[in-house]
């Protein structure tokens, strides 16, 4: 039984240097975010691009209000939330089950099956939009929440299966064998042994896919129509065009508002990535 | 072995779906003349304006628009094309005039509007010139949603500071450009993506409207010496520093406001963007019709862009859509629309909210001006795609125009050969 | 005989045969019905002449011939390759670096956060903000100007510079995801070999090469595999920033496909490009993953 507390692998001076490097790099990474915020806060009437780095005024709230008015954003929030939670949860479970079948249960021709699922991500999404629209409108799935959940789940599965399959290969096979000797069924082993061990991977997949779905524009554009079904970014994108509509700072403010929930999601899930796995429990 | 079965299963599912697809689309016209009409538009930014118009249409025609806006024009085109095959074919949708509309009409996908036009022309609601744009084989299809004239916008403060008046001849316009350049001000806005055609359009039509017409019918080649001459003039102007940096990503309305350039050649819907950017119509900005390049022309050519409002022939809401179209043409609807949208009205009996646009409408209606279809609508799509790219490349790196023109002409040759 | 009840792990041939099929079925079905069926339609269309109206007309391989005849197609392929190489080098490399730096570091999770935030910014926001930074006279030029560099290149106009800067903008958004995936990989590494190596006096680079890198392999395969696939179908950022221009200088394959399909309504030609892109991507992914995955864990 290895001890749970791990000694730091590097010396303290190295820690300081690492922290410093990360802090500097992190600040560099936040510069575009800074520009996004200060320019989203400029009033459209006084907005210029000649002093991009300086905050001039603070009209963020009125810009956000204008963005919500122009795009009908409020109607979309609830359904987008449903898509961004339900679809990734299903996809994570389905993907983990696939990984479990290939790695732990040693499914025959596992690699071929894996490629079959992974192959779902390789072609550009734009190519399947029109046949999907055609099929959806024939099967009465067009402009329904069920239809949106189905398609979002399907496109999240390959990524989820890929990560989970590879994550499970890091778990020694004798973990599985030991559980079998304890008399557990495969279902039980999956839910009680493998899934808990993979919690950080599951959470990572969930937040990445939830963010992806939350930010989806294309599928929402083609497969939905009414304000209550359309996802949020599709609604948001509608307010900007050559033929007038929102000004740049309003667009930025809308974009900022839409990004907030995902940032909060990232903040809330950080603790899942703070520790290593307790792999020694079997 | 099992893995080899995957394609089989999938193929079976695919053939099943194709079987489904081959059963034609469309629904039965339900004949309703009042109620909620599903409306699709690629001018998504106008959605609030359409919603505002509902107040008028509900009380007068008892029809409410349920608007779905598509912010991506290309996805929108594909969506509408596909929808004709399904029972979602739209009761009302926006489209483009020119070859794109002709294509739909040829496939019998659009409901005829000849009766509506006859009534509108008889009532003096619309000009016969505009009817031409909507006529195919002697019949009319769709009704005009919006109309825009392509003019020159300018920053009034810059013109005032430099003591410049609106030009009335091409030579005056050129001397203004020279003067501004001398004062360290860039005269014209340009971009290397999408809106790359307007200066070419302006100079070709302004030199000879028939030459312009010939390009769109394939009778004139892009490598024609007269076209090459015009491109050489453009190149000289580029080299003289008359155009803004093609790499700038500043919104053109903001660019005009902050004086990055003094003038922009744009459609008259640009008022909305300028107002939104905080400029005041008639105070901070104004517009003039660009004088003809060739002073001997009797009429000054003005590019016009008109977006149609169409009804699908096989839509379940065909009658409802046509009823709305008829109401749309009326002065009452157009006055309400002009109030909501603030745009030029095609109906001379409608009241236009913005005096600058009102004046523009009256000006171009006089005999001194001649309207021609904008390059974007006049040019067949495959040629247009290549031309927009090539003009963009020319704008980014101005040089010998021949290679650019030859590339466009190669595509034009292919296209016209296929039309035989 | 139900395999679920099997108690002898190495008994018979394959006691989990049915169970395994049951576990993989939902994934395969979901992907097949919603993604592969539409793809087959696309493949069929690639052998036809179709403008989105009426019925497709079978023309055999004509679209493919036309595709390879087009000189712009070659430019598109080259740009796409530049994207593949660039995204392997920059976001994957930096992502690994960040994962290693934050690994077992106090507060590491919070130091990783700034890199994840860009991923939360929606695609519209990314294209808008980077156009704003990289446009001539934009935020970057203003910053450089403040340090006395006034003669800056036209970032989004001059090729192939425009592709390079767009790769960097993509890296800005993608690094956090890669760092997160590598972190999960690091977390799954058992502690014993690490302890042993450290007792042997291994540190820094040697520890990385001898222990971490080999053990990170499963997750490296994920990151590299996803990176190859994503970069081969690069679309959003290019469409948002240069639309493939000026001319066709920064066009990628996905953009060429999009243009033919959606702008020109040449559904057949667009589909042919999509099929070509899919085959190339799948081939690259299989070659890479076979080598990375199958040697150790599966037969």
What kind of region is each of these model predictions?
Chain B
Residues 2-102, 166, 279, 290, ...:
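Conserved N-terminal structural module of periplasmic/extracytoplasmic solute-binding proteins
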Residues 82-83, 90-91, 122-157, 186-187, ...:
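A structural signal for short loop-to-beta-strand junctions that line the ligand-binding cleft
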Residues 98-150, 174, 282, 286-288:
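Hinge/lid segment of periplasmic solute-binding proteins
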Residues 114-126, 192, 208-229, 276-280, ...:
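Short, solvent-exposed loop/beta-turn-alpha elements that line the ligand-binding surface or hinge
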Residues 137, 141-145, 150, 174-220, ...:
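Extracytoplasmic/periplasmic solute-binding protein
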Residues 179, 217-246:
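Glycine-centered hinge/linker elements that transmit conformational signals in sensory
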Residues 228, 232, 240, 277-340:
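Extracytoplasmic/periplasmic substrate-recognition and gating elements
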Residues 343-344, 361-413:
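C-terminal capping/gating helix-and-loop segments adjacent to ligand/active sites or protein-protein/ligand interfaces
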């Amino acid at each position: 039984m290895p001890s749970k507390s791990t000694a730091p692998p590097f010396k303290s001076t190295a820690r300081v240097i690492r922290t410093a490097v990360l802090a500097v790099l992190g600040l560099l990474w936040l510069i575009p975010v800074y520009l996004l915020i200060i320019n989203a806060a400029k009033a459209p009437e006084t907005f210029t691009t000649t002093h991009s780095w300086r905050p001039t005024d603070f009209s963020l709230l009125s810009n956000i209000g204008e963005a919500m008015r122009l795009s009908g954003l409020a109607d979309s929030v609830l359904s987008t939330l449903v898509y961004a939670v339900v679809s990734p949860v299903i996809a994570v479970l389905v993907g983990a089950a696939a990984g479990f079948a290939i790695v732990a249960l040693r499914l025959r021709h596992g690699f071929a099956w894996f490629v079959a699922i992974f192959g779902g991500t390789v072609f550009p999404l734009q190519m399947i939009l029109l046949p999907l629209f055609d099929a959806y409108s024939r099967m009465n799935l067009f402009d329904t929440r069920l239809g949106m959940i189905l398609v979002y789940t399907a496109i999240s599965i390959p990524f989820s299966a890929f990560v989970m399959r590879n994550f499970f290969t890091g778990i020694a096979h004798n973990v599985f064998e030991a559980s079998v000797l304890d008399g557990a069924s495969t279902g039980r082993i999956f839910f009680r042994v493998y899934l808990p061990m993979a919690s950080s991977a599951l959470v990572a997949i969930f937040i990445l896919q939830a963010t992806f779905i939350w930010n989806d524009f294309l599928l929402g554009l083609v497969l939905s129509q009414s304000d209550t079904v359309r996802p949020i970014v599709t609604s948001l994108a509608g307010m900007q065009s050559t033929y007038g509509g929102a000004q740049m700072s309003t667009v930025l403010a809308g974009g900022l508002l839409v990004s907030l929930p995902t940032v909060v999601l990232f903040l809330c899930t950080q603790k899942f990535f703070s520790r290593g796995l307790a792999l020694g429990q079997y | 072995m099992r893995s080899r079965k995957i394609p089989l299963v999938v193929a079976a599912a695919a053939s099943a779906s194709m079987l489904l697809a081959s059963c034609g689309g469309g629904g039965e016209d339900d004949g309703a003349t009042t109620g909620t009409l599903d409306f699709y538009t690629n001018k998504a930014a106008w959605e609030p304006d359409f919603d505002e118009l509902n107040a008028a249409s509900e009380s007068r025609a008892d029809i409410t628009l349920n608007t779905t806006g598509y912010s991506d024009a290309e996805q929108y085109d594909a969506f509408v094309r596909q929808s004709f095959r399904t029972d979602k074919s739209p009761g009302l949708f926006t489209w483009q005039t020119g070859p794109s509309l002709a294509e739909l009409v040829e496939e019998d996908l659009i409901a005829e509007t000849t009766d509506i036009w006859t009534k509108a022309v008889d009532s003096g609601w619309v000009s016969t010139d505009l009817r031409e744009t909507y006529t195919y084989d002697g019949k009319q299809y769709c009704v005009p949603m919006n109309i825009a004239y392509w003019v020159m916008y300018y920053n009034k403060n810059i013109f005032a500071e430099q003591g410049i008046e609106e030009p009335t001849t091409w030579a005056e316009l050129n001397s203004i450009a020279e003067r501004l350049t001398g004062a360290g001000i860039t005269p014209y806005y340009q971009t290397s993506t999408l809106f790359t055609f307007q200066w070419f359009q302006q100079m070709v039509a302004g030199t000879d409207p028939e030459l312009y017409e010939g390009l769109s019918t394939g009778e004139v080649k892009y490598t024609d010496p007269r076209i090459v001459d015009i491109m050489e003039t453009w190149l000289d102007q580029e080299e003289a520093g008359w155009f803004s940096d093609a790499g700038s990503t500043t919104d053109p309305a903001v660019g005009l406001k902050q004086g990055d350039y003094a003038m922009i050649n744009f459609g008259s819907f640009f008022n909305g963007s300028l107002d939104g950017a905080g400029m005041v119509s008639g105070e901070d900005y104004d517009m003039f019709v660009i004088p003809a390049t060739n002073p001997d022309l009797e009429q000054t050519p003005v590019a016009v862009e008109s977006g149609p409002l169409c009804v699908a022939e096989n839509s379940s809401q065909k009658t409802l859509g046509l009823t709305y179209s008829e109401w749309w043409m009326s002065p009452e609807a157009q006055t309400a629309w002009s109030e909501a949208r603030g745009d030029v009205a095609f109906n001379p009996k409608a009241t236009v909210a913005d005096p600058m646009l009102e004046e523009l409408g009256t000006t171009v209606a006089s005999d001194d001006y001649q309207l021609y279809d904008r390059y974007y609508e006049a040019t067949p799509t495959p040629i247009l795609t290549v031309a927009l790219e090539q003009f963009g490349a020319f704008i980014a790196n101005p040089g010998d125009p021949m290679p650019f023109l030859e590339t466009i002409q190669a595509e034009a040759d292919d296209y016209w050969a296929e039309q035989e | 005989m139900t395999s679920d009840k099997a108690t002898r792990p190495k008994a018979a041939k394959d006691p989990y045969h049915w169970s395994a099929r049951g576990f993989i079925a939902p994934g395969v079905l979901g992907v097949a019905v919603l993604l592969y069926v539409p793809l087959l339609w696309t493949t069929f269309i690639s052998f036809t002449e179709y403008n989105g109206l009426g019925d497709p007309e079978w023309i055999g391989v004509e679209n493919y011939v036309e595709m390879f005849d087009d000189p712009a197609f070659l430019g598109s392929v080259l740009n796409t390759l530049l994207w593949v190489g660039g995204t392997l080098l920059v976001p994957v490399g930096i992502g690994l670096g960040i994962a290693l730096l934050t690994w077992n570091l106090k507060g590491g999770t919070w130091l990783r956060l700034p890199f994840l935030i860009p991923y939360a910014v929606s695609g519209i926001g990314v294209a808008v903000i980077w156009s704003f930074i990289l446009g001539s006279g934009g935020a970057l030029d203003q910053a450089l100007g403040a340090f006395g560099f006034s003669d800056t290149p036209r970032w989004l106009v001059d090729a192939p510079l425009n592709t390079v800067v767009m790769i960097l903008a993509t890296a800005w958004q993608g690094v956090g995801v890669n760092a997160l995936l590598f972190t999960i990989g690091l977390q799954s590494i058992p502690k014993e070999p690490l302890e042993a190596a450290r007792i042997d006096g291994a540190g820094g680079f040697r520890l990385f090469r001898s222990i971490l890198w080999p053990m990170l392999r499963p997750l490296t395969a994920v990151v590299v595999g996803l990176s190859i696939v994503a970069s081969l179908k690069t679309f959003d950022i290019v469409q948002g920033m240069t639309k493939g221009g000026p001319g066709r200088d920064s066009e990628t394959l996905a953009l060429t496909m999009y243009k033919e399909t959606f702008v020109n309504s040449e559904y057949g030609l667009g589909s042919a490009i999509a099929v070509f892109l899919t085959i190339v991507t799948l081939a690259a992914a299989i070659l890479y993953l076979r080598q990375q995955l199958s040697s150790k864990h599966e037969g």
